[in-house]
Amino acid sequence: MTEELHSIDGTFVDLSAHIKLRVAGNDRLRFLNGQITADIRKAGASNSIQACLLDAKGRLTAHASILAAPDYFLLDADPELKETLQSRLERYIIADDVSVEDVSKLWSIFHLIGKTAPASPDARWVVSARRFARPGWDIWVDALHREKMLEQLSAGSSFCDSNCAEVLRIEEGIPRWERELTNEIIPIEANLEESCIDYDKGCYVGQEVISRMKMSGQRNKKLCGLISTEHTSLTPGMRLLATPAKDKEAGWITSACHSARLSKEIALGFVKRGFNSPGTKLVAAASPDQAGEIQVEVADLPFIH
């Protein structure tokens, strides 16, 4: 299936390129709970959680999904984190009985969107997960059986390739590493508060900053939807300018695509406080190698409810 996806339920994506880490040892629960923004005790073998890892200033170092097996936890994250996620965890292992192992080559992951769990006898785990801000299922299978599982899923579901998955991600307002999520972003700014942050779980790296932001109720910028009112394509990296004078920079675009379901050119971007209310009109300034300006309107996320 191409990016022109019209029906979402019963659609599946291949996440096998994700980095996958196994965290084991007697201190694994206590250790991970001190590293992530979510409560690791809520992860199970039939349901996963989403969590962020932060630095001491509350800025993102990773975003991951986590499931709990009887003797270890499994984390998976965008492939762009392959070189940094394991070292980020190991940096904080002092006298803990904890090991972190890269098991990316051992497992393949598929995600099926829909409320009904798939019948997957060859799967090691079928885990409830909200990858696209809606009910779905992660299917973990031995990497040797990846092609077999792909065939089984394709027999009854629609495959969403990488282009299709990117459009769906943008339509649903889901941030991705190296696009919306970087080492300069605080998770609340990227709308990850509801899905990733537990304010009652106890201490973790970066907690003080997150707690202060919650108490103040303010964030300097916010991840927003943007719609081209001229039906002209938008481009990641475009600057957003306040109208009508265009003398104030209001933010920047991080991801963009054409949405066939909306018949519109849409984008995700960070918009500064004072300019991020839905309906606000802004100008997207062309990248240095392009010419022209595009009128855009701030929109609620997700684009499609």
Model regions: which residues?
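Short, intrinsically disordered, mixed-charge
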Residues: 33-41, 83, 87-95, 155, ...
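Glycine-rich, small/acidic residue-mixed loop/short-helix segments
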Residues: 185, 191-197, 204-207, 211-305
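Short glycine-/aliphatic-rich beta-strand segments at the starts of folded cytosolic domains
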Residues: 13-34, 101-115, 218-229
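Acidic, low-complexity central loop/insert segments
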Residues: 11-13, 20, 65-176
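Residue-level signal for inorganic ion chemistry
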Residues: 25, 75, 112-114, 139, ...
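Anionic-ligand-binding alpha/beta catalytic cores of soluble enzymes and soluble regulatory domains
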Residues: 140-227
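Short amphipathic beta-strand starts and helix->beta connectors
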Residues: 1-8, 51-63, 93-96, 119-127, ...
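Acidic, proline/glycine-enriched N-terminal capping motif
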Residues: 1-63, 67-70
